[in-house]
């Protein structure tokens, strides 16, 4: 374990200067893709995505780790309500696991949403991660099998990051379910996936953008998303090895946002350029920009993930 920690610290120190700004990235406006009410502009690493300094040291995204059995998720303990806001993670390899705030874990006693970005180092001990409930009304004695539920949409992620308030998260989920008039039988955020019409629309969007990403150069590390006259948000990661395994769940989250509140694209390029310039000009500008419009996750001073959104007042 000490051997691994030494090399992980070395990796962080060696890469600490490579922050997620225009120094290392560029926004590929010429490769923007648009389908119906969603426009996506890829963000690329200069000089290609490139292999990380040491592939064995790079964290594995949660969805990949779950599918490969590198990590398991269980309830923290009994049905006591003090356990609602925690999940227990156990790693089963020598690789760290990267968990992103806004990812949804389905099952257990109720569906949950990860509160903040976290890196789980390999350990034989239990590790506990803070979560919020996104399934009001079910806290069952019987546990369902845990599964991966994609990223939440941008509105719900904003409420999570700006309030960390369980009641406001439930209200936002309820608002979305009511506004969408989804054919479902619960108050769960994921219940919209029971609606056949929703699934058909979502699949149409997903196939279009998934195909575009599959056909472009593999140096993309993030993207900015637009609908109507506004920027929905952006997600940028430290390398292709983190971005591509999370591409599908990220797309599902942004597509869900557009299905619920998207409008025909009217936003011109200049406001997008100003938005991205403020975000990527340099580290100081980035820190100031995300103060009320997103978050930056760092590990040892090294930026792992930048997520932004359009500031709006959360549901009260």
Positions of predicted regions on the chain:
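Intrinsically disordered, low-complexity segments enriched in small/polar residues
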Residues: 19-92, 96, 102-121, 126-316
């Amino acid at each position: 374990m000490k051997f691994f920690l030494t090399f992980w610290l070395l990796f962080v120190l060696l890469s600490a200067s490579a922050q997620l700004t225009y120094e290392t990235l560029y926004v590929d406006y010429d490769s923007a893709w648009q389908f119906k009410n969603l426009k996506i502009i890829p963000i690329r690493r200069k000089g290609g995505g490139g292999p990380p300094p040491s592939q064995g040291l790079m964290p594995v995204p949660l969805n990949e780790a779950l599918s490969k059995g590198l990590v398991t998720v269980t309830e923290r303990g009994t049905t006591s309500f003090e356990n609602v806001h925690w999940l227990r993670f156990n790693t089963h390899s020598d690789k760290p696991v990267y968990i992103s705030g806004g990812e949804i874990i389905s099952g257990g006693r109720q569906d949950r949403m990860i509160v903040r970005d976290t890196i789980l180092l390999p350990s034989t001990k239990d590790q506990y991660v803070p979560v919020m409930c996104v399934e009001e009304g079910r806290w069952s004695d019987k546990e369902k099998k845990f599964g991966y539920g994609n990223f939440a949409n941008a509105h719900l992620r904003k409420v999570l990051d700006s309030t960390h308030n369980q009641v406001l998260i439930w209200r936002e989920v309820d608002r979305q379910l009511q506004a969408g008039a989804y054919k479902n039988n619960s108050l769960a955020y994921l219940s919209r996936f029971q609606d056949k019409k929703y699934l058909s629309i979502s699949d149409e969007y997903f196939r279009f953008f998934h195909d575009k990403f599959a056909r472009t150069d593999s140096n993309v590390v993030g993207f900015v998303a637009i609908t109507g006259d506004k920027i929905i948000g952006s997600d940028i990661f430290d390398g292709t090895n983190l971005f591509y395994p999370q591409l599908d769940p990220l797309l599902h989250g942004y597509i869900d946002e557009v299905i619920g509140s998207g409008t025909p694209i009217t936003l011109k390029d200049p406001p997008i350029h100003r938005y991205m310039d403020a975000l990527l000009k340099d580290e100081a500008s980035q820190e100031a920009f995300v103060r009320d419009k997103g978050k930056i996750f760092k590990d040892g001073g090294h930026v792992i993930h930048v997520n932004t959104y359009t500031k709006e007042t959360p549901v009260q």
